[in-house]
Amino acid sequence: MRRLMSSLMWGPIARLAAAIVALTGFAMISTNVTAQQPKAVKIAVIVPLSGAWARQGQLVKMGAETAVNEINAAGGIKALGGAKLELISGDAGDSAEKAKNAAQRLIAQEPDLVGGMGAWLSTFTLAITEVTERAQVPWLTLSYADTITSRGFKYVFQSSPPAGVQSTEAVPTIVELGKAATGKPPKTAGIIGDNTASPVSFLKPMREGGLEKLGMKVVLDETYTPPLSDATPLIQKVRSTRPEFLLFISSTISDLKLGLEKMNEFHLAKGAIPVIGNGAHMGAPEVVKNVPPELLEGVMFIVANWGLKGQERISDLYKKQTGEPWITQDGLAGYGHTWILKEALERAGKADKVAVNEQIHKLELKSGPAADAFPGVVKFDENGRRVGAPLVIVQWQSGVPVSVFPTDRALAKAKWPKS
């Protein structure tokens, strides 16, 4: 009887002990698996998310988010054991001071950042990169100002052709497009530009004899501070001088809207005077929501990137994830810059900002998502400028902004507006 009672007592105890051992073992295995999960790698995007340039900043951020989702879904950073990318965002706001403060805060709060991108407006980018350079955080930007990569910085990379290069190459190209369509080149030109860094850089060669060298006389040259409250004084001068084409270089959609509406009121729109702009905001989806398509028809603008042949996969992925009707330079830049950081991390083999910076300097990408996101090769010179970065010319046609140059990759042929 005593043996029977002992057996009955020890049976449950033994089973309980076995269960505890099994659970303990499972917990140890689970803890071990968790411990082996690689730490997320943090990258930053600082763009305007409030103020006049918020929409453009949102497009950049959405492009970066599209790339992060794609990279993480495909297994993350393979050289780091499948570590996921984590995108940390900061709001550059509506001034250079706010942009600089955003960079200082983000870097202080996230000391393990390995790289970043932003800040859309060149004036903001100049301020932010003063901070990121000191912190040795590699920074990729689509901003145009020549001064961004002429300061001797080692941690700044400009994927766009600088504004000076764009203006030097773009206007002759556009003049030839006009000549091919009308049979004669324009003889007079007008200039209206705001006083932010990129328009100033873009127009500098034109104001210093570039247009005269092309056989054109500058009959109007006006500078203003954005955003405009009333475009009447500027457009009255366009009406009185009647240039054969107008360089309208603004950094805000609201200024473009006011300018085109006033030109229409004065019977100068719809091709009466061809308008050429600069910057991706001129092709943002909301432009056509605010400006009648007939006023936009034929308007051309110069960018560093737009939807081209060979970018269909990226465009479709972006549109599916964001719900946007088309991909702009901003979305392509956010996507492409993220992939550049991914490629540099794979080559560095560690989540270290200095090592990532060294690898970006060594990149020469001709294929893959990072290369597909940009026209031309992804390779940077010692100053951080992308080598041979070509410009892209876009034109509003039937309510949609389509690439018309370079002609071998463009999605449409250029149409010179006619009066």
Question: What are these model-derived regions, one by one?
Answer:
Residues R2-L4, I13-T24, A35-S419:
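Extracytosolic ligand-binding ectodomains
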